[in-house]
């Protein structure tokens, strides 16, 4: 989960190595980037960072990525009855890939990692459904990004895991 893929292009791989060294903390990759259904240059790269001081990591990221403080969005997530808080930043333009980094306090590390592990290996039938969705979205762009995301949430949260006591809110900052 905290390994940088060997098959990333050299620039992308170096970006994550440099970022990890600069932040002096582990990067936890999660989602399709850890599975065989990852599509290079199409699938997004999701990363979680756990820390005792979110603001310190955000400041370091701000300097590393040369972004303003309002680039970070606030996360409020009800996960298995626990309210989780954090921050997210998109770093697409720095990686030339769809990439998102989430920053959480170490207090939430155990529950978040437990949730992330559920998605690192998937049953065969879920893999087939994802293959169909990704083909319709990436290869034959029949599904819009919004529709693709909605169907993917249904596949994961209702068919695979059947999440009932979970909700996720992303509070967007005013980007001026």
Report the location of each language-model feature.
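Glycine-rich beta-strand-to-loop/alpha-helix junction loops that act as flexible
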Residues: 30-32
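Catalytic core of pol beta-like nucleotidyltransferases
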Residues: 1-17, 22-23, 34-42, 51-176
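Acidic Asp/Glu-based divalent-cation binding sites
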Residues: 44-46
């Amino acid at each position: 989960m905290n390994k940088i893929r060997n098959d990333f292009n050299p620039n992308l791989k170096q970006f994550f190595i440099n970022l990890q060294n600069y932040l002096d903390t582990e990067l936890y990759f999660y989602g399709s980037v850890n599975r065989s259904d990852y599509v290079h240059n199409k699938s997004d790269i999701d990363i979680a960072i756990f820390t005792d001081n979110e603001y310190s990591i955000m400041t370091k990221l701000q300097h590393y990525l040369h972004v303003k403080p309002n680039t970070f969005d606030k996360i409020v997530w009800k996960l298995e009855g626990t309210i989780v808080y954090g921050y997210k930043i998109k770093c697409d333009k720095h990686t030339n890939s769809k990439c998102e980094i989430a920053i959480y306090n170490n207090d939430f590390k155990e529950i978040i990692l437990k949730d992330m592990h559920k998605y690192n290996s998937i049953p065969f039938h879920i893999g087939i459904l994802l293959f169909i969705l990704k083909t319709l979205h990436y290869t034959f762009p029949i599904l819009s990004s919004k529709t693709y995301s909605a169907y993917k949430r249904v596949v994961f949260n209702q068919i695979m895991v059947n999440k009932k006591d979970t909700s996720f809110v992303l509070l967007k900052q005013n980007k001026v």
